[in-house]
Amino acid sequence: MRAVYLTPSSTFPTEFPSNTLFGAICTGLSDLGYDVDGLISRYPEDPPFILSSTFPYVTAGGRIHHFLPCPLLPPLDVRREEDFDNAKRFKRVRYLHEDVFRDLAGGDLRLADLIAGLGDYAIDRGMLARESKTPVLERDEVEIPHNRINRLSSESEAFYHTYGSMIRNGGYYFLIRFYDTAWEPPVRAALRFLEDRGVGPKTSGGQGQFSLTFGDIAIQERP
């Protein structure tokens, strides 16, 4: 499966769901002169491509560490008190390191065993990895100062609005699969267009800037 990496170079949106990402790509395609209405009309019966939301990745030790959302798993029957505490901790996990995800999705690791041995895993900022030395995404939320006028006193008042984050050791990626390969060059062109312009609601102020790279990733899929 194709992976598209967005490495932020300025304040970047904290989350980028698939519908927002698809809309941004369609905007880029439209600005480049492609038939977006014709593209969208194919989706009920014959989708040209599908894509995921963005997920975090970390660059460390000469490799890219992908993190993926927790797969949907059957409810766990927790009986031991220590497992109950671990299950509560696990509920706060949003992303799994790709190695853990593959083991869970492939059936090599049972959820019950993961919960029972949760103390052997590293959990930081909602990201779970098998080893404590595995880095997690280092990001700091950014507060943007604004001014507003008090209508009663006509005085200027400062307030702060949290927007996105600054990332130091990675970025975000999303997965995309083309069923109609004729659309791959246009989508790549639209992504390059977005790379030049930026993404998100604050691009005019220099936010949402990123560099773009393409790659491949093997994901365990259901038969």
What is the predicted role of each segment?
Residues M1-P223:
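Conserved active-site/ligand-binding neighborhood in enzyme cores
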